[in-house]
Amino acid sequence: MVGKTSKKSASVAKKTVSKRSTAKPKLLTGGNPQIAKADGDAPVQAYIAAMPGWKRDVGRRLDALIVSTVPSVRKAVKWNSPFYGIEDQGWFLGIHCLTKYIKVAFFRGTSLSPVPPVESKQKEVRYFHIHEDDVIDEAQFAEWVNQASQLPGERI
């Protein structure tokens, strides 16, 4: 039997692999998708695809606005949230799903003009919350993204 796999073991292994590849991401508290930490566009797109309900379309639109504003943007998923940054400058923005809204964090938000509306406990961070029925001012959002991308980013 050396070097051989029993039929039962091979069958169990196949089932385990197929379950992993077809499993949908788990939604954490507030409906935030659980996506493994990774760099690049693919994990960010997996996060967006796993965003529940109305948040998915908003996530796609935010991602498109960020990419069109900063074509050289660097992407990653860290701590179950997409991060956007500039190579060798750090991260300037993060997105997180909560029960009733999407939270966009501008890590140097107090340096933006106008300052995004929601305060943070962290000195420089400001948030922009998007609720289901909100109309996003895309020009303002793109301007924040443009300004944020030119500031020193967070080293995370």
Regions from the PLM with identified roles:
Residues 2-156:
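Charge-dense, helix-prone N-terminal extensions
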